[in-house]
Amino acid sequence: MRHKNTLQKGSVRYIIFKEADVWYGVALEFNIVEEGDNPIKVMASLFEAIQGYVETARKLKMRPMPLNQKSDKEYEQLWDKLEEAKTLSKQEEVFSFGYTPFRDIAAAC
């Protein structure tokens, strides 16, 4: 099986969204979830967690599988819905979504 993400390069889909009074940040391929009361802080925390995850994988010379996990069905459905709409105006509970490449994560914060 050929993996999209490798230790050298790749990208991660992410979603920053609100449920009730809590903001969540999800990195789909890594199954990382961050939460907080501010979407910008949640996004920064999520990107920091992604960067740490990739750095640890590289340091341990892991196989690509942990960088290409199957994401939770709930988040996949939300991603598909957002991709279909391609607009945030209809999705008020979503602050941001997209792809972030491994190499540019630190610069995105």
Predicted feature locations:
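Short, charged, surface-exposed hinge/linker loops at domain edges
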Residues: 1-12, 44-109
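Short aromatic-glycine-(Arg/Gly/Cys) micro-motifs in beta-strand/loop hairpins
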Residues: 12-29
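Short amphipathic alpha-helical "recognition" segments used for binding
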Residues: 17, 38-39, 52
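Generic alpha-helical hydrophobic packing signal
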Residues: 24-26, 35, 49
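Residue-level preference for alpha-helix termini and adjacent loops
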Residues: 29-32, 94-96
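A short, exposed loop/beta-hairpin motif centered on an aromatic-Gly-Thr core
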Residues: 30-41
